[in-house]
Amino acid sequence: MAVVRVIHEALARGESPATLGLLHPDIEYVNPPGAVEPGTRRGIAAYEDALRSMDEAFDDVRIEVREIIDAVDQVVVLATYTARGRGSGAQRQHEDGYVWTIRDGKAVSFEWFHKQADALEAAGLRASG
């Protein structure tokens, strides 16, 4: 859980967790449908490209971590995501969930969910329905 906490602290400062050596070189990054760039990408460069795309699309992005949950092989982060559309000025806010998989002190997988219940379910913490 400590690695995930440090990752989110770095992101809050506008710093890439890659610069801290916290990402596995082959990290898998999964964006949900409806995201700026949905789909799966692999590698640190692709992870950073996805973050850059988000920064290009939105101003004043904030991810406020509400809870970090140890789920044995994974770590779930429940957070409030707020941002303003760079072109439209439209404000967005939603309760997101993130599932991190950590091995040997590095993030090997990050999956973003627009619904916290979906993140919990993906980590085996809550049954569907």
Regions found by a protein language model. Give the residues of each.
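Hydrophobic/aromatic beta-strand elements that line small-molecule binding cavities or substrate pockets
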Residues: 63-69, 82-83, 95-101, 111
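Short acidic-aromatic low-complexity motifs
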Residues: 1-26, 126
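A solvent-exposed, acidic/Ser-Thr-rich amphipathic alpha-helical stretch
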Residues: 17-73
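A short, polar/proline- and glycine-enriched secondary-structure boundary/capping micro-motif
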Residues: 40-41, 87-90, 118-124
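A short hydrophobic beta-strand element
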Residues: 72-81
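Short beta-strand edge/turn micro-motifs at domain boundaries
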Residues: 97-121
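Short, cysteine-centered beta-strand-loop-beta hairpins and adjacent loop/turn segments enriched
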Residues: 56-57, 83-93
